[in-house]
Amino acid sequence: MELQILRTRHPPDIYHAQLANLISQEGHPTKREDITNRLHLLPTKDRLLLAVDGETLLGYAHLRVSDDLVNEETAEVVAIVVEVSNRRSGIGTRLITAAETWATQSGRARLLLKTDVVRTPAHAFFSAQGYEKDSTTIEFIRNLDRPNS
């Protein structure tokens, strides 16, 4: 395997279907067309890190720098996923390292990531990478009715 980490805002089309598959593996059914549309809507400062072996996508991380009144020094890993059959092979570590480099180059002092409470293998992975659990926040969500388009 010749793993490369690509940093991009607009990944090549050959990876769109594979991104949809990775997101679907995590319990969020997604189609290629959804990915193509969502990529065009991402904030301009967002970046994707793609772990690739040639034209095969093995994992990705979605990164965000948000400028707000409270957390100006923080960048966020919005999502990080490694293809199931390639987990525990160092790809996640390479993605996290690349995310930290990007955050530092973006002038940030912290990198935040969130993970579902049921994803205990991910918790162990992030702890092993030196991340500390921050239990000071609770996330609330409400589904909103959208007008028909």
What is each residue range found by the language model?
Residues 46, 135-139:
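Short hydrophobic/aromatic beta-strand or adjacent loop that forms the aromatic wall/cage
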Residues 66, 83, 87, 116:
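Residue-level recognition of the GNAT/N-acetyltransferase active site
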Residues 96, 103-115:
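Conserved GNAT acetyl-CoA-binding A-motif
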Residues 113-122, 141:
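Conserved beta-strand-loop-alpha-helix junction that forms the acyl-donor binding cleft
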Residues 127-136:
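Conserved acetyl-CoA-binding loop of GNAT-fold acetyltransferases
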Residues 141-147:
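Short beta-strand-to-coil "C-cap" segments at the C-terminal boundary of structured domains/repeats
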